[in-house]
Swiss-Prot record:
Lineage: superkingdom: Archaea
Family: Belongs to the [NiFe]/[NiFeSe] hydrogenase small subunit family.
PANTHER family assigned: COENZYME F420-REDUCING HYDROGENASE, GAMMA SUBUNIT, F420-NON-REDUCING HYDROGENASE VHU SUBUNIT G
Disulfide links within the chain: none
Principal EC category: oxidoreductase
Assembly notes: The F420-non-reducing hydrogenase is composed of three subunits; MvhA, MvhD and MvhG. It forms a complex with the heterodisulfide reductase (hdr).
Molecular function terms, GO-annotated: iron-sulfur cluster binding; oxidoreductase activity
Record's keyword annotation contains Protein biosynthesis: no
InterPro entries: Hydrogenase_assoc-protein, NADH_UbQ_OxRdtase-like_20kDa, NiFe_Hase_small_N_sf
Name by which UniProt lists this protein: F420-non-reducing hydrogenase subunit G
Function: Part of a complex that provides reducing equivalents for heterodisulfide reductase.
Keywords: Oxidoreductase
Gene3D superfamilies: NADH:ubiquinone oxidoreductase-like, 20kDa subunit (3.40.50.700)
Length: 308
């Protein structure tokens, strides 16, 4: 019998949801176990951080938030032959990446001093034996070389299981590369995705059946998001939030979506449309278009003017 492949998993700046998607392999987990053994997984097993063995494959969840994350990532890269960046936090920085809108010191002060849920009358900020925050959240691939990326918040378990099995069998791995709109079952109007208002879900109520959500005034990130999920959310009338990140052809997911919105409003064609009025309909532009990918954007953090 051939020697089994040694697999490890690690949880960095993430929420453990990606590890739950591994547990959700269900019976496919048995197929994985025929080819591999889990040798290291602090989330799923009673293993210690200081006992990282040599691994054939390591699946890493979460981005780089603090110096401990960086140290583990670098050690795992040394110990593993093949590194999978697993989940949107690892691939793009994820929701924790919105921390990049503030300085590190501002984040610490808000968490330990200003937060009403953290009684701290003496104003003590932990400093000893506590990992220090990086200057900004970074995708895993910005700190170490990764061999394959599986985005998703969390990744679909069936897709992830197929990726792992293909890897274990030495088969070629290929994920969908089209945008969400190309696989979405909702109908696009023949005149195009024109819109003249932006609404929130509660303002629309129940969207029209089978009609694309964008002409109904809803911000759906489908035009700027890769179709790995199969358009699960728009299929049940929930606008896509972009949790799988952009296609390989798109360098900046938020910029792509802003361009799509401008096109839907016909900003270039109709000179009576004021782009600033369009922007005013969005309360949180960064939080809307960069919810999951700010650390991987062309401008991955807030740039402050000198003196401000």
């Amino acid at each position: 019998m051939a020697e089994k492949i040694k697999i490890g998993t690690m949880w960095l700046g993430g929420c453990s949801g990606c590890h739950l998607s591994i547990a959700d392999f269900h019976e496919k987990l048995l197929d994985v176990m025929e080819h591999a053994d889990f040798e290291f997984s602090p989330v799923l097993m009673d293993t210690k951080y200081d006992e990282i063995p040599e691994l054939d494959v390591v699946v890493i969840e979460g981005g780089i938030v603090n110096d401990e994350n960086r140290e583990f990532a670098e050690e795992l890269r040394e110990k593993a032959k093949f590194v999978i960046s697993y989940g949107t936090c690892a691939v793009y920085g994820g929701i924790p990446g919105l921390r990049n809108l503030w300085d590190k010191d501002e984040v610490i002060e808000e968490a330990y001093i200003n937060s009403i849920t953290t009684p701290n009358e003496e104003g003590v900020i932990p400093s000893e034996d506590v990992p220090h925050l990086e200057g900004r959240v970074k995708p895993l691939g910005e700190v170490i070389d990764v061999d394959f990326e599986v985005p998703g918040c969390p990744p679909r378990s069936d897709v992830a299981a197929e990726v792992v099995m293909a890897l274990l069998k030495g088969e070629e791995i290929e994920l969908p590369s089209t945008n969400l709109c190309e696989v979405c079952p909702r109908e696009k109007p023949p005149e195009g995705l024109a819109m003249d208002f932006i609404k929130r879900q509660f303002e629309v109520g129940k969207p029209e059946d089978d009609l694309c959500l964008i002409p109904q005034g809803l911000i759906c990130m489908g035009p700027a998001t890769v179709s790995i999920c199969g358009a699960e959310c728009p299929s049940i009338a929930i606008p896509c939030r972009g949790c799988y990140g952009p296609t390989a052809r798109v360098e900046d997911q938020g910029a792509k979506m802003i361009s799509a919105i401008a096109s839907d409003y016909k900003v270039e064609e109709d000179k009576t449309v004021d782009p600033e009025e369009v922007a005013e309909q969005l309360d949180d532009i960064v939080g809307t278009f960069y919810t999951f990918t700010l650390p991987a954007a062309l401008i991955p953090m807030k740039i402050k003017k000198e003196g401000k």
